[in-house]
Amino acid sequence: MFIKASLDKSKVVKIRKKYGIPKGNITYTDLDKPAKPLFSAKHKLVGKPDYIVKRKEGHIPVEVKSSSVEIPYKSHIMQLAAYCLLVEDVYNAKVPYGIIVYGDRQFKIPYSNILKTRLIITIDEMRNCLRTNGRLKEKA
């Protein structure tokens, strides 16, 4: 039992170092083994962040990307925002920010009301596009 606990701790330390995952309790991981998807009935949204870290300030979703970039892609920010929304709903928890890890750097993305609103609008637009077979609504 002691050896297994030590190996698990050693593995966690390596994962944290490799991906720059902040200190805190890792409550969810999908990167090193498949995990059950998170589902928000309220927003009809499903997703699997790579990690969720529970810290004093709240739950922090972490998304790991294989590419290296100077600034985060807008699509990756929206993906992270979706994970923030899922964590907020599923865990009924405060989500102050999320983290996107690219190669040797990471970006802390604040989960603001503006980002949440932009995400919900984008989800609504995507659903409308699916309902109308890709046709956009005409603006008055």
Write out the residue ranges for each language-model feature.
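A generic structural signal for short coil/turn motifs at secondary-structure boundaries
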Residues: 69-73, 108-110
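Conserved catalytic cores of phosphodiester-cleaving nucleases, focusing on short active-site segments
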Residues: 45-70, 79-85
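A short, polar/proline- and glycine-enriched secondary-structure boundary/capping micro-motif
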Residues: 71-75, 119-120
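Short hydrophobic/aromatic-rich motifs at helix boundaries and adjacent loops
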Residues: 6-8, 21-23, 54-57, 95
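Active-site metal-binding core of divalent-cation-utilizing nuclease and nuclease-like domains
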Residues: 24-56, 75
